[in-house]
UniProtKB/Swiss-Prot annotation:
Family: Belongs to the universal ribosomal protein uS5 family.
Record's protein name: Small ribosomal subunit protein uS5
Domain comment in the entry: The N-terminal domain interacts with the head of the 30S subunit; the C-terminal domain interacts with the body and contacts protein S4. The interaction surface between S4 and S5 is involved in control of translational fidelity.
Keywords assigned by UniProt, alphabetized: Ribonucleoprotein, Ribosomal protein, RNA-binding, rRNA-binding
Quaternary data: Part of the 30S ribosomal subunit. Contacts proteins S4 and S8.
Organism of provenance: Neisseria meningitidis serogroup B (strain ATCC BAA-335 / MC58)
Gene Ontology BP terms: translation
Gene giving rise to this polypeptide: rpsE
Task performed by this protein: With S4 and S12 plays an important role in translational accuracy.
Length: 172
C-alpha cells in the first residue's frame, strides 16, 4: 500500500489516494504487470466520489482513478462537520458502522474511512469496520452508508410531521 497523498488542483477538490496495487496477468509468454489505483475525491463540503484506475504505470492509473472519482461524485447532507444520525453501510463481506460525534471529538476511524471523511469535510465522527478490511470494500461500504443519510427535514416531509416533532423538541 502506498502512502496517502493529498492534492488540490485548480478545481478546489481534495484528492486522496487510498491504495495502489500491482496486479499480474499470466499469459503464454510470461507475466504482464500493471497497477491498480483506488482514489477518493471530495470538495470538503459533503460531496464525495470514488474511482478505480488501471494502467502499466502508476501515475496514469492514479489519474484515471481521479477522473472516474470526479465523474461519480454524490452529495451527502452534513451537520456541523458530522453526520445527522447513525448509519450502517455494507459491501461484500464488509460492514461499516458510523455515528455522529460531538464537536472536538475528531475522526475516530481507520485507514480508508478516514481518507473518505477528510475529503468530504467531516471533522467529528466515530466509525467501525466489521468483516473484510479490504480497502476497496471499505470505501464502497462507507459510500453506501453515507448515501443512506437523510436530514431531519427529509424525514419530517416523508412522515408528514414537522422538524420539531422529529427532533423531539419540547413545545412547553
Amino acid at each position: 500500500m502506498a502512502k496517502h497523498e493529498i492534492e488540490e488542483r485548480g478545481d478546489g477538490l481534495i484528492e486522496k489516494m487510498v491504495a495502489v496495487n500491482r496486479v499480474t496477468k499470466v499469459v503464454k509468454g510470461g507475466r504482464i504487470m500493471a497497477f491498480s489505483a483506488l482514489t477518493v475525491v471530495g470538495d470538503g463540503d459533503g460531496r464525495i466520489g470514488m474511482g478505480k484506475g488501471k494502467s502499466k504505470e502508476v501515475p496514469v492509473a492514479v489519474q484515471k482513478a481521479m477522473d472516474q472519482a470526479r465523474r461519480s461524485m454524490i452529495k451527502v447532507p452534513l451537520k456541523n462537520g458530522t453526520i445527522h444520525h447513525e448509519v450502517i453501510g455494507r459491501h461484500g463481506a464488509t460492514k461499516v458502522f458510523m455515528q455522529p460525534a460531538k464537536e472536538g471529538s475528531g475522526v475516530k476511524a481507520g485507514g480508508p474511512m478516514r481518507l473518505v471523511f477528510d475529503a468530504m469535510g467531516i471533522h467529528n465522527i466515530s466509525a467501525k469496520v466489521h468483516g473484510s478490511t479490504n480497502p476497496y470494500n471499505i470505501v464502497r461500504a462507507t459510500l453506501d452508508g453515507l448515501s443512506k443519510l437523510h436530514t431531519p427535514a427529509d424525514i419530517a416531509a416523508k412522515r408528514g410531521l414537522t422538524v420539531e416533532d422529529i427532533l423531539g423538541v419540547n413545545h412547553g
